Amino acid sequence: MLCSLLLCECLLLVAGYAHDDDWIDPTDMLNYDAASGTMRKSQAKYGISGEKDVSPDLSCADEISECYHKLDSLTYKIDECEKKKREDYESQSNPVFRRYLNKILIEAGKLGLPDENKGDMHYDAEIILKRETLLEIQKFLNGEDWKPGALDDALSDILINFKFHDFETWKWRFEDSFGVDPYNVLMVLLCLLCIVVLVATELWTYVRWYTQLRRVLIISFLFSLGWNWMYLYKLAFAQHQAEVAKMEPLNNVCAKKMDWTGSIWEWFRSSWTYKDDPCQKYYELLLVNPIWLVPPTKALAVTFTTFVTEPLKHIGKGTGEFIKALMKEIPALLHLPVLIIMALAILSFCYGAGKSVHVLRHIGGPESEPPQALRPRDRRRQEEIDYRPDGGAGDADFHYRGQMGPTEQGPYAKTYEGRREILRERDVDLRFQTGNKSPEVLRAFDVPDAEAREHPTVVPSHKSPVLDTKPKETGGILGEGTPKESSTESSQSAKPVSGQDTSGNTEGSPAAEKAQLKSEAAGSPDQGSTYSPARGVAGPRGQDPVSSPCG
């Protein structure tokens, strides 16, 4: 019995050792033999076990060195695997880049490759990047699984449309930076400059408003004339081109020379049909320039029609929209009363505008009247003149009218009289200094002062007066003529010398001056508008009696 038990234990031990040899370690991939499906016994293990058998007290230093040796061998194997994998990766990508570079050379060769004579060449190409192309490139760069065919197609579609580099296109431009054409910017700045000049110089204060409006309308009309002519010419040219395109099939028919059969056929067609000759229309289109289809009279008629009807068209359109919006919220029964009220309002407005025409005329100021020519050697009464303080400025000249009566003179009448005297004397002096002695160019308000200063003093007497005909230079003016002698009775008033006969000064006697002063003092104030010899003579200080505050 004991022997049988001992035998069983021995068999179990032997079977355990045999099973230990057949056991596969899942972590030991280096000693696993895939062909036999068993584990290989490494020499290091046998050596270690032998050494353990020989010397079980092996030091830890030997075990550490053995571990480092195994680590080095594993690192070497890993490097070899990565190198092999890299070679396989490059072997697959090289053909793709080879074809890509070959395509670039083919496209550039069509334009010309650089050589010893040409030197460097600069090309431009377009790049089209699709979503599929982007995904393939990202897979390739990230080291993921990629397909050489898909990447090759993606790279082939990127570069297209090769051409030479245009250096002018890449230059800096104003439109690229600011998004506006420089011509438009210049025009806007020019308009702003004109507005600033008008505001700074106050030009509108020197030109009457209706004069400005008239000039603007005239300039607009002339500008629109050229504008409409160009528009009509463009329309005629476009219509001419369309007709030429329609006559394209007749090029061969009308261009070739007609034989006798064609002449017979054309005679038959013109005799039995009412159709126009197509070749006539064809040659008219070829020979007549569209510019002759737009005469200036047509442009003038269109411009005038547009100038008149276009504003009325917009006014009517706005009025219609206004009435439509007004009647939309009003009941149908009230439409008629509302229209009547609107008509009455328009008539009232027109009536008020007509009544206020004289007010507008007073604000704007009438046109300056032409100066009246003076009649030589004729005595004429002095017309009382008036300086108008609120007359136009700039283009408008100072307006002189009849003298204001005593009831019309305001608190500033004396100031206006003084200003009138200064301006009138300055005007007369300037005219005589420039040598302008022609009576036709003098205005009516220039002569009385000259007569008052320069005509000889005539004293009524029973004897004919003796005038000093010796020319005397006064204020740098040489007398040009001698006054005409006249024998008058004592009851008659002496005629003042006018025109060119009064340009020379005549010396009078002291008695004559005293007589004139007495006669002036004896004059009544009621004769303000009647000329008298005493009033025709300048006062003691050379002032015009018309401009005196006393009237």
UniProtKB/Swiss-Prot annotation:
Q: Which InterPro entries match?
A: Chloride_chnl_CLIC-like
Biased composition annotated in UniProt, kind: Basic and acidic residues: 380-389
Task: Please provide, alphabetically and separated by semicolons, the GO molecular function terms listed in this UniProt record.
Answer: chloride channel activity
Keyword entries, A-Z: Chloride, Chloride channel, Endoplasmic reticulum, Ion channel, Ion transport, Membrane, Phosphoprotein, Retinitis pigmentosa, Signal, Transmembrane, Transmembrane helix, Transport
The effect annotated for D153R is: Does not affect Ca(2+) binding
Q: How is its activity regulated?
A: Inhibited by ER lumenal Ca(2+).
Q: What is the effect of changing S368G?
A: Found in a patient with sporadic ALS
The record places the following residue ranges in the Cytoplasmic compartment, namely 206-216, 351-551
| Known outcome of mutating S263R | Found in two patients with sporadic ALS; decreases protein stability and expression; decreases single channel activity; increases chloride retention in the ER while decreasing ATP-induced Ca(2+) release; in a knockin mouse model causes enhanced ER stress and motor neuron degeneration in compound heterozygosity with a hypomorphic allele; leads to embryonic lethality with a KO allele
The biological processes this protein is annotated with in GO are: endoplasmic reticulum calcium ion homeostasis
Q: Where is this site: Ca(2+)-mediated inhibition of channel activity?
A: D25, D181
Q: In which tissues is it expressed?
A: Expressed in the retina of the eye, with extensive expression in the lamina cribrosa, optic nerve, ganglion cell layer, inner nuclear layer, outer nuclear layer and retinal pigment epithelium.
State where composition is biased (Polar residues). 488-508
Tell me the leader sequence span.
Answer: 1-18
Q: What residue intervals traverse the membrane?
A: 185-205, 217-237, 330-350
Q: Which residues form a coiled coil?
A: none
Q: What is its main location?
A: endoplasmic reticulum
Residues annotated as carrying Phosphothreonine in the record are: T482
Its UniProt entry gives the catalysed reaction(s) as: chloride(in) = chloride(out); bromide(in) = bromide(out); nitrate(in) = nitrate(out); fluoride(in) = fluoride(out)
Topology relative to the membrane? Multi-pass membrane protein
**One GO CC annotation:** chloride channel complex
Note the subunit structure: Homomultimers. Interacts with mitochondrial protein PIGBOS1 (via C-terminus); the interaction occurs at the mitochondria-associated endoplasmic reticulum (ER) membrane, a zone of contact between the ER and mitochondrial membranes, but does not appear to play a role in ER-mitochondria tethering and is not affected by ER stress. Interacts with CALR.
Described purpose of this protein according to its UniProt entry: Anion-selective channel with Ca(2+)-dependent and voltage-independent gating. Permeable to small monovalent anions with selectivity for bromide > chloride > nitrate > fluoride. Operates in the endoplasmic reticulum (ER) membrane where it mediates chloride efflux to compensate for the loss of positive charges from the ER lumen upon Ca(2+) release. Contributes to the maintenance of ER Ca(2+) pools and activation of unfolded protein response to prevent accumulation of misfolded proteins in the ER lumen.
Q: Which disease is it linked to?
A: Retinitis pigmentosa 32: A form of retinitis pigmentosa, a retinal dystrophy belonging to the group of pigmentary retinopathies. Retinitis pigmentosa is characterized by retinal pigment deposits visible on fundus examination and primary loss of rod photoreceptor cells followed by secondary loss of cone photoreceptors. Patients typically have night vision blindness and loss of midperipheral visual field. RP32 inheritance is autosomal recessive.
Similarity section:
Belongs to the chloride channel MCLC family.
**Protein name per Swiss-Prot or TrEMBL:** Chloride channel CLIC-like protein 1
Organism field: Homo sapiens (Human)
